[in-house]
Amino acid sequence: IVSPPVCGNYFVEVGEECDCGLPRNCQNQCCNATTCKLIPGAQCEDGECCERCQFKGAGNVCRPRRSKCDIAESCTGQSPDCPTDRFRRNGVSCLNN
């Protein structure tokens, strides 16, 4: 059984851009809780690369390097999400010799 999307259930479903719950409970300034759409001018409502309803600029570090083989990830300026965690390619030494 497939049910239609329900605005106000905290799940972003087909046709929704955001879902912060019922209007009386919504604490998200970027989301219109009545329509489950972003407010005018907003690019995003949540994510490591979303700040005050806008994408953070390209180059903002969203996941710092955690080891010598890890590579720091930065926002792209085009998405609210931090890119996939990346590491140095196989065969490259990560040790200080």
Swiss-Prot record:
The record ties this protein, via Pfam families, to:
Disintegrin
EC main class here is hydrolase
Q: Where is the Disintegrin domain?
A: 4-90
Q: What InterPro entries does the record tag this protein with?
A: Disintegrin_CS, Disintegrin_dom, Disintegrin_dom_sf
Q: What does this protein do?
A: The hemorrhagic metalloproteinase-disintegrin-like bothrojarin-1 is a potent inhibitor of collagen-induced platelet aggregation by blockage of alpha-2/beta-1 (ITGA2/ITGB1) integrin. It does not present any fibrinogen-clotting activity.
Which protein family is it in? Belongs to the venom metalloproteinase (M12B) family. P-III subfamily. P-IIIa sub-subfamily.
Q: What is this protein called?
A: Zinc metalloproteinase-disintegrin-like bothrojarin-4
Q: Which organism is it from?
A: Bothrops jararaca (Jararaca)
